[in-house]
Amino acid sequence: NKNGYIVAERGDINRVDKTFSISKTYLSNVVGLAHDKGYIRDVHESVGSYMSTDHFVSDHNSKITWDHLLRQTSHWQGTLWDKPDWADRPPKDIPWTELQTQPLYEPGTFWKYNDVRVNLLALSALHVWRRPLPQILKKYIMPIREMMLKRLILTIH
C-alpha cells in the first residue's frame, strides 16, 4: 500500500503457506555466523575435522567441505537417521535395486538437492555450535530479521 493505493498483490494473504526451503536459508546463516565468529576457520576445510561422528571418515566423504555442503555439491554418501542418501529424490529412470550402486561424483563437481544432505549440514552445524540451532537463531539471527522488517515497514509508510 502506497499513498492509499495497492501497488501489488500476490496470493491469499490470509492463507498459511508452507515454507519448505527455509531450513537452507537458516542453516547458511548459522554456518556463516559460525565462520564470522571463528568457529569454522575456513569454508573450504573438511567438515570431518569438526565432527565427533563417523559421517566423514570414508575416503570420499573426508574430502567434503563446508562449501560443498552449503552449495549441495558434496555428493555425500551414507545414512543419516536411518535414511540413506540415495533414497532421497532418486532418479526416475533408475530401478530401486540399482540406486545403491550409482557412481559417486567428486565433491564440488555435481549439484543435487538432497534432504538427507541438508540434514547432515544441520548436524554438522550443531557440532560446531554445541547447542541447539534454534537458540542460535533466536539470539543472533531473529533480532536482525525483526529490525530489518521494522525498517522495511517504516520505509513503506
Language model features with spans:
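"Short basic amphipathic alpha-helical interaction patches in structured regions
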Residues: I22, S46-G48, K83-P84
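Active-site helix/loop module of the DD-peptidase/beta-lactamase fold
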Residues: K37-W76, Q100, W129-H157
